Amino acid sequence: MSTNDEENGTVIEVKNVPEPSPETWYSVFLRQASVYGVAAGYCLSASLLSIINKWAIMKFPYPGALTAMQYFTSAAGVLLCAQMKLIEHDSLNLLTMWRFLPAAMIFYLSLFTNSELLLHANVDTFIVFRSAVPIFVAIGETLFLHQPWPSVKTWGSLATIFGGSLLYVFTDYQFTIAAYSWALAYLVSMTIDFVYIKHVVMTIGLNTWGLVLYNNLEALLLFPLELLIMGELKKIKHEITDETDWYSLQVVLPVGLSCLFGLAISFFGFSCRRAISATGFTVLGIVNKLLTVVINLMVWDKHSTFVGTLGLLVCMFGGVMYQQSTIKKPNATQEAKPQEQDEEQEKLLEMQENKESNSVDIKETLKSEEKL
């Protein structure tokens, strides 16, 4: 269709824009199947990761080396997916790597205190103190990042976590000074880690996959230092001289699956955040945490008492309340960017939590084997 411009005497072509066709049942089915498939993949990878890690560490009893291979797989996976145009990440830059180095070092410190805590206490104690981290992170954000004090609803959730922690501590029959000293050290290191990581996310200017790449790559570069400090290098050299069956299928298969599932939980976790609501993602997280507690009760022989387990569940419930109270609902366009920054932070912290969960499974398996 064309019209004449009376002033200029030119003909203006007016194109009829076709209206978007309504969705067919097939397209709706594919979209819903994609959402449920991503959610199922996240639950499957998160719940099976601990079992596969236990299998891998029994066949390859070197937690530092296994964790390093998981770091390598995650970093290589990001680079490969970027080459295939599936994701986008920030390019590697030496100056940015130098700026990110303190965050990687603090992350390693949190893993070290995590390992020492597991050597002196059971998994229940770890879960309780891990659940108490948001209390001190909220205070640290206010004091050092100039964030507003939490709302009344958030304080209520933090108080629930604190109450559950006290209930657990007062009924812990395995209480020792050494265990709770390392628990406090873990609490402090994790608080510093989370607050500093948020500072990095807010100031360093990397997107989600860029943060994942830098975090895993620099953690991998720090691995030789851990190898020397923890004495794992001597053990590996001893095994090499004994010509063990490292290259057999019974070793390569569980180690390979452990690395692949570590990457899968990151991929499905980020995909879930895009495909479902924050509430739905929280529900999936609850299911995975409950499965962790159930597996812990079924596999290990030393647990907290019934009241202690109840306190642990109260802590988890408080954590759910805390997640819900911090979900932001933007009312205007200018609020979109801060919310995106918060999502970037949550995704990186989720990645760190996954790495720590891997360390929990690996260290606890070794501890149980030593008792046997």
Swiss-Prot record:
Molecular function via GO: antiporter activity; nucleotide-sugar transmembrane transporter activity
Tissues in which the UniProt entry reports expression: Expressed in rosette leaves, stems, flowers and siliques.
Biased composition (Basic and acidic residues): 346-372
Domain of life of the source: Eukaryota
Keyword Transmembrane belongs to the record: yes
Keywords: Antiport, Golgi apparatus, Membrane, Sugar transport, Transmembrane, Transmembrane helix, Transport
GO BP: any one term: nucleotide-sugar transmembrane transport
Localisation: Golgi apparatus membrane
Ranges for region Disordered: 331-372
GO CC aspect terms: Golgi membrane
Topological category with respect to the lipid bilayer: Multi-pass membrane protein
Record field: transmembrane: 33-53, 60-80, 92-112, 125-145, 155-175, 177-197, 209-229, 251-271, 280-300, 303-323
InterPro entries, alphabetized: Sugar_P_trans_dom (IPR004853), TPT_transporter (IPR050186)
Pfam families linked to this entry: TPT
PANTHER family: SOLUTE CARRIER FAMILY 35 (PTHR11132)
Family, as annotated: Belongs to the nucleotide-sugar transporter family. GDP-Mannose:GMP antiporter (GMA) (TC 2.A.7.13) subfamily.
Function: GDP-mannose transporter that may be involved in the import of GDP-mannose from the cytoplasm into the Golgi lumen.
UniProt-recorded name of the protein: GDP-mannose transporter GONST3
Taxonomic source organism: Arabidopsis thaliana
